[in-house]
UniProtKB/Swiss-Prot annotation:
Gene Ontology annotations for the cellular component aspect, listed alphabetically: cytosol
GO BP annotations, alphabetical order: protein folding
Predominant location: cytoplasm
Name of the protein this chain belongs to: Protein GrpE
Subunit field text: Homodimer.
Annotated InterPro entries: GrpE, GrpE_coiled_coil, GrpE_head
Natural source organism: Shewanella loihica (strain ATCC BAA-1088 / PV-4)
Length: 205
């Protein structure tokens, strides 16, 4: 083959090689784009799965929080119910004790420590009453004995009013029956006689 013929074929060979290289590059690029597309799809799938998992975790966390709150509410309501039941039972029991205390106080009023015939009885009842009131005080039962105090309609029940030079107006001048508080709540008001103050002056005399 002549040199001229070889030279004529060289551009064709180079062009063919260039086309082959370009084709290979295009195919590689296409393959790479396909891999990138698949990778993007996979990333999206993983992101969706992660979002779903996070949502599930939040849902479960919220359920746990609600369950814990409900348990706490049930525990609180149970504690309140127990406290109410305890107070009601104690209040009922205390109301049953009040007549016993009243009777012992009347027994003391009907006897005298100065009278030898009743001195032993007086001292025995007095000691019993003192011990009894001290015992019930441990459970929150306290007396309302407002002798000489200002009349308080929240704790006292007036059974009458009388003029008095000794006591100012609206002052408890006599306690007919002591009242009682149970854990700072009124159990029974004190029955009292209230002073009207000094007798009015007759200006026409």
């Amino acid at each position: 083959m002549s040199k001229e013929s070889n030279k004529a074929q060289e551009p064709q060979i180079e062009e063919t090689e260039a086309v082959a290289v370009e084709t290979e590059v295009v195919e590689d690029a296409a393959s790479l784009m396909d891999e990138l597309t698949q990778a993007n799809f996979r990333v999206e799938e993983l992101e969706q799965a992660l979002a779903a998992a996070e949502a599930k975790v939040e849902e479960q966390k919220d359920s746990v929080i609600r369950a814990a709150a409900e348990v706490e509410n049930v525990r609180r309501r149970a504690a309140i119910d127990v406290e109410k039941a305890h107070k009601f039972a104690l209040e009922k029991f205390a109301n049953e004790l009040l007549p016993v205390i009243d009777n012992m106080e009347r027994a003391l009023q009907g006897t005298s420590s100065e009278d030898e015939a009743t001195k032993a009885i007086y001292e025995g009842v007095e000691l019993t009453l003192k011990t009894f009131t001290s015992a019930v005080a441990k459970f929150g039962l306290t007396q309302v004995d407002p002798q000489g105090e200002a009349f308080n309609p929240d704790h006292h029940q007036a059974i009458g009013m009388q003029p008095s030079e000794e006591f100012p107006a609206n002052t408890v001048m006599m306690v007919m029956q002591k009242g009682y508080m149970l854990n700072e709540r009124l159990l029974r008001p004190a029955m009292v006689m209230v002073s009207q103050g000094g007798a009015s002056v007759d200006t026409q005399a």
